[in-house]
């Protein structure tokens, strides 16, 4: 990857999000852990997965809790159960949320790969 020419951190950050390859986007999909999970596992943040229970901390839906329905790697967004808006024609559409605006309160499935990540 070529380095951006700008010296401004905000432009460098935008460039990173726009040009990151799919296998590099895992780092951009981390969310903070709740105090209980942080104390239990000794980690501050971990990658969000489908099935995790999260609490939205910022934005229009702050305070809402629900399960992660989908993780969109291409757009670096997640969709949460119950976080929808109504379109003009009456259909419900899920609102994509950036993972940095949520807190993981409970893990969905803890398989072997995630166990290794938590035990590191």
Curated annotation (Swiss-Prot):
Q: Cellular component terms, GO, for this chain's entry?
A: large ribosomal subunit
Question: What's this chain's function?
Answer: One of two assembly initiator proteins, it binds directly to the 5'-end of the 23S rRNA, where it nucleates assembly of the 50S subunit. Located at the polypeptide exit tunnel on the outside of the subunit.
Q: Which InterPro entries match?
A: KOW, Rib_uL2_dom2, Ribosomal_uL24_CS, Ribosomal_uL24_euk/arc, Ribosomal_uL24_KOW, Translation_prot_SH3-like_sf
Q: Which GO terms describe its molecular function?
A: rRNA binding; structural constituent of ribosome
Alphabetical list of NCBIfam families matching this protein: rplX_A_E
Subunit composition and interactions: Part of the 50S ribosomal subunit.
Task: Supply the name of the protein.
Answer: Large ribosomal subunit protein uL24
Reply yes or no: does the keyword Zinc apply.
Answer: no
Family note = Belongs to the universal ribosomal protein uL24 family.
Keywords in alphabetical order, please: Ribonucleoprotein, Ribosomal protein, RNA-binding, rRNA-binding
Q: Which domain of life is it from?
A: Archaea
Q: Which GO terms describe its biological process?
A: translation
